[in-house]
Amino acid sequence: MDKTNYRQTEYNKPFIIQRADPYVYRHSDGTYWFTASVPEYDRIILRKSNTVDGLAQAEEVTIWRKHENGIMSVHIWAPEIHYVDNKWFIYFAGGDIEDIWAIRPYVLMCEGDDPLKDPWKEMGMLKPKDAFSFQDFSLDMTV
């Protein structure tokens, strides 16, 4: 990394309370996006700000809620937001209430340009490229 484009900053305080698995994404327009696991592990939230510090006070929007049963009905963990090929995606782990440790990676895609306001579509479980990936406990992945 070119040191003229890098500035180290220390954050010595709690960033956002009651949020596990935090993920911050800096978009090409300079805005920062935040998502994380919530204590109830039942939904996916987003925050947006023009600064990293601003994320702490930014409005939190629930963009998706767990299913009542079946896949994606329990242990909604470790979401990440990414912008790929001009589309917004959230990758996260989720379990099945009938087998709560059958945690697998899933994908949501925003159907518009505004992740805070536009609807999100469930794209399903990530598809493995081999015979062993995602066949067992799978979480905290990245793209």
Residue ranges and their predicted role:
Residues M1-V143:
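Carbohydrate-active catalytic/glycan-binding domains of CAZyme proteins
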